[in-house]
């Protein structure tokens, strides 16, 4: 299989380039993209990329796979590449490239931080944990599972246009996660923080974020 990998080191390269590497795929095996990338790295050890859990939990290996953002560790090549086709790997769009497939996540984290993604409760601390009914807890399903891979925000044109201002899909999801939490007492404060033009109102309903989320959020 031919693998085309985005190569760029801002400290030494004048501009990015795609490097083609031929890798041998074991017959009858449907490897994950991360496995193919590891085979390519065996041929060129200078290729830089992030990876950790290999199970779609840590979110560290988010990248653009044949034009679609996703996690390399849980994307099978049968899903990403047409028969006889090429596998093209690029960094997540819209974020500064540190090197090759590694991007600087600082802007993403700063926008995420704006929504105060943690429980706020000014009531006296109870002797035990703050309880919820099963129905209250159920409202959080589909909200809390975000793994901060940034596949959603870096698929969003509004984030590309205003990465230093727009909270982005991941931040908006977490904002609602705590608005929906019966234990949180900062609803008014949270809603006030979402009224500026670069929060909820910057979302254009394009839905790229939903299409690429590895957790189906």
Predicted feature descriptions by range:
Residues 30-46, 87-217:
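Ferredoxin-type iron-sulfur electron-transfer modules in oxidoreductases and energy-metabolism complexes
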Residues 5-11:
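Short polar catalytic/cofactor-binding loops
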Residues 68-83, 87-89:
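Glycine-rich phosphate/adenylate-binding loop and adjacent beta-alpha elements
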Residues 18-31:
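Short, contiguous acidic and Ser/Thr-rich linear segments
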Residues 24, 64-68:
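Short strand-turn-strand beta-turns centered on an Asx-Gly dipeptide
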Residues 1-3:
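Short structural boundary motif marking the start of a folded domain
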Residues 53-62:
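Short, structured protein-protein interaction patches enriched in aromatics and acidic/basic residues
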């Amino acid at each position: 299989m031919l693998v085309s990998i985005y190569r760029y080191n801002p400290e030494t390269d004048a501009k990015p380039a795609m490097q083609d590497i031929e890798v041998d795929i074991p017959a009858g095996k449907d490897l994950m993209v991360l496995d193919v990338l590891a085979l390519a790295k065996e041929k060129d050890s200078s290729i830089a990329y992030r990876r950790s859990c290999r199970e779609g939990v840590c979110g560290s290996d988010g990248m653009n796979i044949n034009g679609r953002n996703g996690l390399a560790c849980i994307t099978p090549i049968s899903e990403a590449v047409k028969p006889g086709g090429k596998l093209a790997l690029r960094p997540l769009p819209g974020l500064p490239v540190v090197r090759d497939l590694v991007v600087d996540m600082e802007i993403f984290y700063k926008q995420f931080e704006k929504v105060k993604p943690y429980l706020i409760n000014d009531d006296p601390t109870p002797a035990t944990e703050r309880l919820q009914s099963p129905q209250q807890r159920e409202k959080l399903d589909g909200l809390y599972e975000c793994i901060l891979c940034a596949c959603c925000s870096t698929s969003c044109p509004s984030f590309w246009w205003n990465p230093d201002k727009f909270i982005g899909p991941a931040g908006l999801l977490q904002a609602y996660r705590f608005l929906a939490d019966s234990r949180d007492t900062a609803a008014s404060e949270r809603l006030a923080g979402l009224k500026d033009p670069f929060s909820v109102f910057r979302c254009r309903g394009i839905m790229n974020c939903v299409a690429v989320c590895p957790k189906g959020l």
